[in-house]
């Protein structure tokens, strides 16, 4: 049913549907979970949508306004399961709960939206991906430049960047991978983000500069944004202001866990565009999965905090050699302790996200239990860390801290096995509060009291079927078989008649019931009060807890890299401010882990006198693997990891560009060749003398002569204008003549051994040129008919002899 039809003739709807439509009109773009007793029900278009998304039954809720009401529902106690699925699909949900009866005659229960869930603003553990950041982003464009802001409410992280091109924006979106993106209604580059699951057009008013400026200063209790480095940066102020305003409105509260704003200086890390990240398969493979990626090999962290941090590092390798060398030194120092440390770190819970829920006051009793168990192991962690002679590890140890006061509080205040929610009671530990213990004892003793009362009355009345029972509707009651009703005293009041029994009440039992129920209510109210006080007591420690979580994350990453270095036989790289890359007997970090035979090691030397390496050889001969492994080793070195090589010297690298693999972009009408030329154009315009450039088979998408001409001219541009460190693979033998023309070029090749129509690859790079591409021999491996291969061989001989 269309929205306009639903809204028409409101007077013809039932009171309940009127209430639903009124609430739904406030959240038109969200699924409205409308509580009806023990179920959340959805109606009309929402019902049809959730039925399709979750494959649940679509039924009907009678008629209203003379039309069938489509309906679908989920049990309240299983709602988190369904909410998790919907959030992963990019859906947003408004949770509408029952409040109280407002009209005794009509019995229409008051309802209101108590919670809004969007993919980018969730903090609940069950709705989050354990090992992934959960960013929401906002974009503002002005004068062909962009302000880009990201916020992870589950971690308390808030960052901004100034971006100078749409290509760089795409790269930053790929790096941060936001679950939700906000953009202004006049945004002209929607095509950059339209393929993502959850994008939201926002009014220009939400990006207002003055309002954004005030909001940010109010959030951080400042009078200027100078301290964050963005006072005059209107682009990022607009983006950050819109983002902050949106998250506050969705969260229906202030954001005490957002304590600082980090300006992301793009020049601090090695730049990699979207194409580079995709072709190198750093955290996602070509299919969008995590397997067979650099992250899959390197990320054996034992905490979810560490896993998230390592992926952040992999997406932003550093140019700051001081930080990188500190990490290398730490990885080396940890090599004798990684087993002990990983054993302890496995017991560390997600303190980073628990901190955020503490600040937002949404932490569950189980969060407190997890925090308590984490704080309990810190002394043992310190004992090991004190043995390690490393300045950086000492700095991490001091940031981790001890938190004896918080631990003491949690041990005294929180039960060993509390209930899931505070509303269920049983969260506050015994002996923490005398009044609470007394109230609880009333209920505990009630069983004994009821048992004694039952035995006494049973004996007095001599009724064998006499029993005292309880249910939530009528409370305590006496149940007696109908054959004994003649023995009932006059002061017994009948309250219910069943087929074979009757139920009674007596004043004494009712008085005791009120006493028990009153004690339960008072007990629960007191528990809630004490629970809130625990948040107040912990609040002064929140900033140190956040710092401790970050330190534990970094320790986990460094310990993990130390284990990887030992287990995978990695070498500590030398980071040099000088120009060039020297790798001796290097290996591909991912490919070597999946081979059944030993990986063939290869070296590479790039310097001011050898800036470009042209590589020839057969398809499947190892050219692409070789080029990728060099880039991956540079990335590994840049995050503080040891690398797969016997010796590695990495110079100052500012950007990595790759043009490897081919694909059409049919949605924008671009052919494979056009995509190739656009990517090459981007490289030629943006690569510097400190950039690493990897190009696979440039010019293959057009005629041989034109392709060769383009490859020749682009190569000369890279040599003489960009002066970048370049590896270029080709099947154009004529391109290798550049070695004679340009003094900075060197030819290398991968060779193979051919027998009849069969081929064996050697995977070893050597000086010189491979004059054959062995295309027909490689084609034979695909299963082409022998007659086709023989015909192709004859034609090749004919062409070569012409």
Swiss-Prot record:
Cite the binding residues for ATP: 617-624
Q: Which Gene3D superfamilies match?
A: 1.10.1420.10, DNA repair protein MutS, domain I (3.40.1170.10), MutS, connector domain (3.30.420.110), P-loop containing nucleotide triphosphate hydrolases (3.40.50.300)
* Keyword DNA repair in annotation: yes
Q: Which residues form the signal peptide?
A: none
Gene Ontology cellular-component annotations: cytosol
Matches recorded under SUPFAM superfamilies: DNA repair protein MutS, domain I, DNA repair protein MutS, domain II, DNA repair protein MutS, domain III, P-loop containing nucleoside triphosphate hydrolases
Q: Name one GO molecular function term.
A: mismatched DNA binding
What is the superkingdom listed in this entry's lineage?
Bacteria
One GO biological process term is:
mismatch repair
Q: Which UniProt keywords apply?
A: ATP-binding, DNA damage, DNA repair, DNA-binding, Nucleotide-binding
Family assignment from sequence similarity = Belongs to the DNA mismatch repair MutS family.
Role: This protein is involved in the repair of mismatches in DNA. It is possible that it carries out the mismatch recognition step. This protein has a weak ATPase activity.
Q: Which PANTHER family match?
A: DNA MISMATCH REPAIR PROTEIN MSH1, MITOCHONDRIAL, DNA MISMATCH REPAIR PROTEIN MUTS FAMILY MEMBER
Name this polypeptide is given? DNA mismatch repair protein MutS
